UniProtKB/Swiss-Prot annotation:
UniProt subunit comment: Component of the dynactin complex composed of at least ARP1, JNM1, NIP100 and ARP10. Dynactin comprises a short rod of ARP1 polymers attached to ARP10 at its pointed-end and probably associated with the capping protein at its barbed-end. The rod structure is implicated in dynein cargo binding. A sidearm formed by NIP100 projects from the ARP1 filament and is implicated in motor binding. Interacts with ARP1.
GO MF terms held by the record: structural constituent of cytoskeleton
Protein name: Nuclear migration protein JNM1
Organism in which the protein naturally occurs: Saccharomyces cerevisiae (strain ATCC 204508 / S288c) (Baker's yeast)
Function according to Swiss-Prot or TrEMBL: Component of the dynactin complex which assists cytoplasmic dynein by increasing its processivity and by regulation of its cargo binding. The dynactin complex is required for the spindle translocation late in anaphase and is involved in a cell wall synthesis checkpoint. JNM1 is associated with the rod and links it to the projecting sidearm. Required for proper nuclear migration during the mitotic cell cycle and for astral microtubule development.
Pfam families named in the record: Dynamitin
Gene Ontology cellular component terms for the protein in this record: actin cytoskeleton; cytoplasm; dynactin complex; dynein complex; microtubule
Region annotated Disordered, chain positions: 33-53
Domain of life: Eukaryota
Primary localisation category: cytoplasm
Modified residues (Phosphoserine): S91
Record's keyword terms, sorted: Coiled coil, Cytoplasm, Cytoskeleton, Dynein, Microtubule, Phosphoprotein
């Protein structure tokens, strides 16, 4: 029995030229005389061996046609499988095929070959390949299990964990603690940061100290020259002298009532200075609570604005409700008028209906009289 070697690359079959083999027009019938001797078969075998083909003797056209059709269907099936495999590879981001996947793929291909109608020798070869594949699969699975066991044994064997050598220096921590205490003391004298953040201007402590220094300098005066308050006092004295020398001052000197009134209403510079000092001391007492009062006033102002907005909206709604009520009254009046007109129309229609009935009765009587005559 001759064997067809399917893995030989020298055999190139043109399947496109064999597509029309099922057509009745392309079929040709060849007649051949059967010889008793086997010379013809030997000549055919020799010619086929020269061409590189091994042909089975005694094979009819139907079996050849079936074999070609099966080969074509197998090729199409393999092409579809390769397309599906390519699509899977692309969907898996072109990952490399592992050894277990290769063995699985070989097993599937061998199962497909088992299904086909092949010769006994090819079936034996396929069985041998299946055995080799199963052996390789068992070897790979055993290797994986051994590796897992080794990894688990090495992992379970590690009972102790080596930590890095960390040296803690307590001197830096103590320094930080001292600095924190100093900062807390400074905050007590300077002010709380939360109160500073609550203010809108958020001025620094240095700028606030400069402002206080300027205000104190205005009140106490400068050591190098005359104080500013002294200059202010001298200017007030000059203005007082000018006022006395003016016409109004002369009138006041002449009229005692006018003088008493002006003196009672006049505020002396000493009183002004005392009032400024008292205000300064009062401001110094309430300087911590002034930002909170300012924030409270702002919140009350916002609340007042919201109340005004609500009042305006309610006022607008009230005006709209009144306009709707007026429109309702107008519509009610119009409906009453329509009701009256409908009643009048109904009365008129009834009167007209009675007149029509009377006319119909008279016409019926006249018709009966005419018929009787």
């Amino acid at each position: 029995m001759n064997v067809i070697d399917l893995s030989d690359p020298a055999i190139n079959v043109d399947y496109d030229s064999l597509i029309g083999i099922d057509n009745e027009e392309s079929q040709e019938i060849f007649e051949n005389e059967v010889k008793e001797d086997g010379q013809q078969e030997e000549q055919e075998e020799a010619s086929s061996r020269k061409d590189g083909l091994i042909v089975e003797p005694g094979r009819d056209v139907e079996s050849l046609r079936r074999a070609i059709r099966d080969q074509l269907l197998f090729k199409i099936h393999r092409q579809n499988q390769s397309d599906c495999a390519d699509a899977r590879k692309l969907s898996n981001d072109e990952e490399d095929e592992s050894r277990q996947q290769k063995l699985e793929r070989i097993r599937e291909e061998l199962e497909e070959l088992k299904i086909e109608n092949l010769t006994s020798e090819m079936q034996t070869e396929i069985k041998e390949l299946c055995e080799i594949q199963s052996k390789l699969a068992t070897e790979s699975s055993s290797r994986l299990t051994n590796l897992r066991k080794k990894l688990l044994e090495t992992y379970e064997g590690q009972d102790t964990v080596i930590l890095p050598n960390i040296i803690l220096d307590t001197s830096n921590i103590k320094r930080l603690q001292k600095l924190d205490q100093k900062i807390s003391l400074m905050e007590r004298f300077v002010g709380i940061p939360e109160a500073l953040e609550a203010e809108e201007d958020r001025k620094s402590v240095h700028s606030k100290v400069n402002e206080l220094y300027r205000s104190i300098q205005l009140l106490q005066g400068d050591d190098k020259a005359e104080g500013k308050l002294q200059k202010f006092r001298d200017r007030l004295v000059e203005l007082n002298e000018e006022f006395e020398n003016s016409l109004l001052g002369k009138k006041i000197q002449q009229d005692l009532r006018l003088k008493d009134d002006t003196v009672s209403k006049l505020v002396m510079p000493e009183n002004k200075v005392k009032e400024i000092n008292s205000m300064y001391s009062m401001f110094k007492q309430y300087q911590d609570s002034l930002p909170l009062l300012a924030e409270r006033m702002k919140s009350l102002n916002k609340m007042n604005n919201r109340v005004i907005e609500v009042y305006e909206t309610t006022k607008g709604l009230d005006s709209q409700i009144t306009s709707i009520q007026e429109q309702g009254k107008v519509w009610l009046k119009a409906l009453n008028e329509l009701d009256k007109k409908f009643d009048e129309q109904e009365v008129k229609i009834r009167e007209n209906m009675e007149q029509i009935r009377r006319k119909i009765d008279t016409l019926e009587d006249e018709a009966l009289q005419r018929n009787s005559k």
